[in-house]
Design a protein with these regions (language model features):
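Short, structured coil/loop segments at alpha-helix boundaries
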Residues: 26, 30-36, 52, 103-107, ...
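N-terminal-proximal low-complexity accessory segments that begin disordered
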Residues: 1-49
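Short N-terminal amphipathic alpha-helices
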Residues: 47-62
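N-terminal cap/leader regions of alpha/beta-hydrolase-fold enzymes
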Residues: 28-29, 36, 59-66
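Glycine-rich flavin
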Residues: 61-145
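Generic short alpha-helical segment signal, independent of protein family or function
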Residues: 44, 48-51, 118, 140
């Protein structure tokens, strides 16, 4: 699968057929609910900008696992340049959305887990890092949020 479009992201949420409650009331059309949709729109913006050539340098990165272009939110930082682009990307998204765009914690988490599993395997003889890398391959291939 290639990079997701904003529309594919929104449809992927609708396809989950989740049972969601807000303030004790079931929400049938959660994708279009007025309290939920603004957050969905902000996340969708991360996909929209990734598809725009003028933002490609900030929004995409070359995967160190495959060499393919991936959404920077699914990328493991490899250099100080990656970190600088991450910050510039976050500033851009903040300017475009005027809000939280919901993906920063996940990006920071995958980078931490990559490092920690590597160190755990070296110290404990476990196999977490290889398994995490396999997870990352799928995450990048399917452009998960």
């Amino acid at each position: 699968m290639a990079l997701k479009t904003a529309e594919e992201f929104v449809q992927s949420l609708a396809d989950l057929h989740l049972q969601i409650y807000l303030f004790g009331e079931q929400v049938d059309d959660y994708v279009n609910h007025p309290l939920i949709r603004p957050s969905i729109n902000c996340i969708a913006t991360t996909y929209e900008l990734a598809a725009m050539p003028e933002y490609e340098d900030l929004m995409l990165a070359a995967s160190h696992l495959t060499g393919k272009k991936v959404n920077r939110f699914t990328h493991i930082h490899q250099s100080t340049e990656d970190l600088a682009k991450k910050v510039k990307m976050q500033r851009l998204l903040g300017q475009k959305t005027g809000s939280c765009f919901q993906r920063c914690v996940g990006m920071d988490a995958i980078n931490a887990v990559d490092s920690v599993t590597f160190e755990m395997d070296a110290r404990l003889g476990t196999d977490y890092h290889r398994r995490f890398r396999n997870f990352m391959l799928r995450m990048q291939e399917e452009d998960w949020t």
